[in-house]
Regions:
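Register-specific beta-strand positions within repetitive beta-rich fiber domains
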Residues: 1-3, 19, 25-26, 35-38, ...
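Extracellular/surface-exposed low-complexity repeats and stalk/linker segments enriched in Gly/Pro
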Residues: 1-14
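Short non-domain terminal segments
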Residues: 13, 35, 44, 60-61, ...
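Short, mixed charged/polar active-site loops
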Residues: 29-31
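Periodic small-residue-enriched repeat registers in elongated scaffold domains
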Residues: 70-319
Length: 319
């Protein structure tokens, strides 16, 4: 007479896998090894109509139905959520589709077709963004790149590029920060190409001088180091320590020269100054001044013109 299950000797752990287990198959009781059953169970798909396997912590499990976890979820390796790809060591993707985190410790929070390809790089979301520099960040937007330079940042916007070391583009469209530590706040097609250069906004502006700044406007240039353009259109501060506050087509072309406003004014002498008006020129060195008016020329050393039209101060200290 057979024994009841309660009468059998107790099992002993750990199992080696070659223990025999009884199973009914095609109306016949058959024996199989424990390892053969576990191989089947761990290789099956979860949530399908034909399979009802048991999950195992010793193999990769594939669930096709909704799962709920009560409590904490932790992982010592990679984390992938959504239809995305993780390649980098300890990289993680929290959601979205078509994302790739190939850098070590790289992360992507979500979005579509984003790439974090360098170590410790991060993409927050958006579409077709790329964080390719070490410790670089793209917050969101579309088609943005934080690459080449270490710790480069793009906050958002469209088709912006931060390639300089520790450079940043906060937003806007098609802006480029290629200088180390350079910053663009926003706008359209602005370029901060020199170290520590800054463009707050506007369009088609270029800050090419070291530590130069453009506040706004359009088609403005700072090619001198430590030069500044406040705004306006087509202004050029093209020598060191020069400034153009605003206006149209104004230029400061010698050291310490400045133009405040107006149109087509030029301060081309050392420490020269044009206040406003149109087509005025202060070309004399040692602080020549044309305050306003039209077509005036202060070409003498320390010369001065207050206003009027077509006046010339060509002698030393002429007024």
């Amino acid at each position: 007479m057979g024994k009841k299950i309660s009468q059998l000797n107790r099992n002993e752990l750990p199992y080696e896998g070659n223990e025999l287990v009884a199973i009914v198959e095609t109306a016949e009781t058959r024996g199989g090894t424990l390892s053969s059953f576990m191989n089947y169970l761990s290789g099956a798909k979860y949530g399908t109509a034909q399979d009802s396997p048991i999950a195992t912590p010793l193999a990769n499990n594939f669930f096709q139905a909704t799962q709920s976890v009560v409590g904490d979820l932790s992982a010592s390796g990679k984390l992938v959520i959504g239809t995305s790809t993780v390649v980098g060591t300890l990289a993680s993707i929290a959601g979205g589709t078509g994302n790739t985190a190939s850098g070590a410790c790289a992360t992507i929070a979500g979005g579509e077709s984003n790439t974090a390809s360098s170590n410790s790089s991060h993409v927050g979301g958006g579409k077709s963004n790329a964080a390719s520099g070490v410790c670089s960040i793209v917050g969101g937007g579309c088609g943005n790149t934080a690459g080449t330079g270490t710790c480069a940042v793009v906050g958002g916007g469209d088709t912006n590029t931060a390639s300089g070391h520790t450079s940043s583009v906060l937003g806007g469209t098609t802006n480029v920060t290629s200088g180390g530590g350079s910053i663009i706040g926003g706008g359209l097609k602005n370029t901060a190409s020199s170290n520590y250069s800054v463009i707050a906004g506007g369009c088609y502006n270029i800050a090419a001088g070291t530590s130069s700044a453009i506040a706004g406007g359009g088609n403005n240039r700072t090619t001198g180091n430590y030069s500044t353009v406040g705004g306006g259109l087509s202004a050029n501060a093209c020598c060191n320590y020069t400034a153009v506050v605003g206006g149209y087509n104004n230029k400061a072309t010698d050291l310490y020269a400045g133009v405040v406003a107006g149109g087509s004014n030029t301060a081309s002498g050392l420490s020269s100054f044009v206040g406003a008006g149109a087509a005025n020129i202060a070309s004399g060195n040692a602080g020549s001044v044309a305050v306003g008016g039209m077509s005036n020329a202060a070409s003498g050393l320390s010369s001065f013109i207050g206003g009027g039209k077509s006046n010339a101060a060509s002698g030393c200290g002429a007024v």
